[in-house]
Amino acid sequence: MPTGDFDSKPSWADQVEEEGEDDKCVTSELLKGIPLPTGDTSPEPELLPGDPLPPPKEVINGNIKTVTEYKVEEDGKKFKIVRTFRIETRKASKAVARRKNWKKFGNSEFDPPGPNVATTTVSDDVSMTFITSKEDLNCQEEEDPMNKLKGQKIVSCRICKGDHWTTRCPYKDTLGPMQKELAEQLGLSTGEKEKLPGELEPVQAAQNKTGKYVPPSLRDGASRRGESMQPNRRADDNATIRVTNLSEDTRETDLQELFRPFGSISRIYLAKDKTTGQSKGFAFISFHRREDAARAIAGVSGFGYDHLILNVEWAKPSTN
């Protein structure tokens, strides 16, 4: 590889290191050939050890300002700092211009005009938008009718009066038996169905859980006639109500809990889909007494249940 000898002038940094033993960092001889940013080639004063540092010098040439400062390091070496600024003229409001003329105080009492990098951080401008009261009123959201329903209870628990189903009450194992026992003592038990004057008590099968075969003639209900042969079948049709607008998750137990407080229920029919098993949205509830059915219509019709408004009316009599 060809090589050649180049007669290059040593750099200023190399000469400073070579003269470090003499504690001469910057001399007039080294500064003669270095042009200043302002175009001034006048020699700089010699920085000799023990001599005081020259005062800072500021030169303005058009829109360029050059600031020259001298400092001493910990090891005693002296060096020069040259900073160049571009002067820009910007229009500001009277309030901003007035604040810039305020007298500085504290550690910045003797600082020159303008920000000091030691105590001031210059960042991007933040624009602020002030909204008047009229604009604030226009930005208000319109009142949503559904917000009024948020504070209302759609479902009420019979045990703790909370906004959840009675079957999902966390206190049903503790408060439920206590309320039932208290109701039995007062004669207001809701667990026992009301008996009609002509209704027979069902015959309980004695020891029917032993695994032995029990003939149909000895099973529970063998001494009673079939449901279709009862004389009060037609009376049930007169005390039957029709409930519509039910949710798909409604079950017979939910209807039993909803309508039991109004009276004794003889039967419940909930229309379900054959494939999915979900409710079709309507059901029929038959009471033993027509007065109980009338009270159920007055109490449940228009009631909010599972986020839906129920519609209860008299069922049309069967044509069969």
Swiss-Prot record:
CDD domains linked: eIF3G, RRM_eIF3G_like
InterPro entries: eIF3_g, eIF3g_N, eIF3G_RRM, Nucleotide-bd_a/b_plait_sf, RBD_domain_sf, RRM_dom
Record note on modification: Phosphorylated. Phosphorylation is enhanced upon serum stimulation.
Residue span(s) of domain RRM: 239-317
Modified residues (Phosphoserine): S8, S11, S42, S189, S223, S264
Family recorded in the similarity comment: Belongs to the eIF-3 subunit G family.
Subunit structure: Component of the eukaryotic translation initiation factor 3 (eIF-3) complex, which is composed of 13 subunits: EIF3A, EIF3B, EIF3C, EIF3D, EIF3E, EIF3F, EIF3G, EIF3H, EIF3I, EIF3J, EIF3K, EIF3L and EIF3M. The eIF-3 complex appears to include 3 stable modules: module A is composed of EIF3A, EIF3B, EIF3G and EIF3I; module B is composed of EIF3F, EIF3H, and EIF3M; and module C is composed of EIF3C, EIF3D, EIF3E, EIF3K and EIF3L. EIF3C of module C binds EIF3B of module A and EIF3H of module B, thereby linking the three modules. EIF3J is a labile subunit that binds to the eIF-3 complex via EIF3B.
Name of the featured protein: Eukaryotic translation initiation factor 3 subunit G
Organism lineage string: Eukaryota, Metazoa, Chordata, Craniata, Vertebrata
Gene: Eif3g
